[in-house]
C-alpha cells in the first residue's frame, strides 16, 4: 500500500504524529462501538458529529452490548484540507463481539471514518491524545455530556481543539 500523503495535516501542525493519531483513532473507534452497544449517545458528541453518531447507531436493533473490539488493520488512507478544516480518512478492519436478542456473535467490520479538526490546531502531547480528555488544559477527565471539560469548562466539540469524527462514509458489518 502507498502511504497517505499527510502534507495537508503537517503543513498546519508540525507536531502531528501518525502513530499517535492512529492510537487516538482506535481509542475513539473502540469506545464509540462500546457505547453503541450500550445505547449511550450523548458522551460521543464530544468526539463525533451527530451525523456520524446517527450512522454508527443505524443498526442498533436488538443490540444489547458490544465488547472485545480487536483491530486487524488501521490505515490512514487520505488527508485533505477543506472549509477551514483538516480531514483524515481512516479505514478500520476489526472484529468485535455483539450481543443481540440474547445471542452472542463475532462480527467482522470494515469501516471508513473521516476525522476532522480546525486547520492550524496543534496536536497535543501523546498522553493527552490518548486520554480522550481536554486538549486545552490537559485534564484527563472525559468531557461532560454537554461537551465541556469538567476542569476548565472549555467546549470540546466541532473539531475546534481536537480531532472529531465528522462522518462515517462507509460501514460494513457482518457476522463471522
Q: Residue locations for each model-derived region?
A:
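Short metal-coordination and nucleic-acid-contact micro-motifs, chiefly zinc-binding Cys/His arrays
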Residues: 127-131, 144-145
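Core segments of small alpha/beta cavity-forming domains
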Residues: 1-66, 136, 145-146, 150-155, ...
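Surface-exposed, charged secondary-structure patches
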Residues: 63-105
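N-terminal alpha-helical segment
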Residues: 25-28, 70-72, 130
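A short, surface-exposed beta-strand/turn
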Residues: 101-124
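Short, intrinsically disordered, charge-biased short linear motifs at domain edges
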Residues: 118-125, 133-140
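Generic secondary-structure microfeatures
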Residues: 48-51, 92-96, 119
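Envelope-exposed proteins and targeting segments
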Residues: 86-88, 111, 130
